[in-house]
Amino acid sequence: MIDYILLIISTALINNFVLVKFLGLCPFMGVSKKIETAIGMGLATMFVLTVASLCAYLVEHYLLTPLHANFLRTLIFILVIAVVVQFTEMVIHKTSPTLYRLLGIFLPLITTNCAVLGVALLNINLAHNLTQSVIYGFSASLGFSLVLVLFAALRERLTAADIPLPFRGASIALITAGLMSLAFMGFSGLVRV
């Protein structure tokens, strides 16, 4: 049990996919202008990452490895992720049309979010079992969602701030992301990985 807690902490905080591994930067910068949108994108990504980790483990161990088709891993994982994203998109469209409109093009772009594919491939490379794969996917999405919501809150505050003209827009957003990355580096001594 303690191993799973350490896996959650190390994946969500210490080895954060956005601030440490630099995966998932497109939705991080694109959807982080409003907190409501960031929360919706975080929840959608959380669902997709967790389910995609489960599906990728099952496909790897029950389809690709027995058939010695490991060379197709990336292609098959992209197809699995696309199916999971389509399912998520249909659910959000039926349950919350407002959130569906707010997320816009970024919802189908979860398919090409490199963090989702990165988690699936890292699960295989780290030789996680089924439980560890699901927890790793959930933890990565938890860290992604946490950073996304915190960054959206900071960007909302920045819109009200008096920022010099050369730093407005993407410049101050990148500076803020860099400062967040420095803050998350403070967690690096928390757990030995």
Curated annotation (Swiss-Prot):
The keyword 4Fe-4S does not apply. It is a multi-pass membrane protein. Its EC number is 7.-.-.-. The chain crosses the membrane at residues 5-25, 39-59, 72-92, 102-122, 134-154, 171-191. GO terms for biological process: electron transport chain. Keywords: Cell inner membrane, Cell membrane, Electron transport, Membrane, Translocase, Transmembrane, Transmembrane helix, Transport. It is an enzyme of class 7 (translocase). InterPro entries: Ion_transpt_RnfA/RsxA (IPR011293), NqrDE/RnfAE (IPR003667), NqrDE/RnfAE_oxidrdctase (IPR050133). It is found in: Cell inner membrane. GO terms for cellular component: plasma membrane. It comes from the Bacteria. Part of a membrane-bound complex that couples electron transfer with translocation of ions across the membrane. Belongs to the NqrDE/RnfAE family. HAMAP family: RsxA_RnfA (MF_00459). The complex is composed of six subunits: RnfA, RnfB, RnfC, RnfD, RnfE and RnfG. This is Ion-translocating oxidoreductase complex subunit A. It comes from Histophilus somni (strain 129Pt) (Haemophilus somnus). The lineage of its organism: Bacteria, Pseudomonadati, Pseudomonadota, Gammaproteobacteria, Pasteurellales. The gene is rnfA.
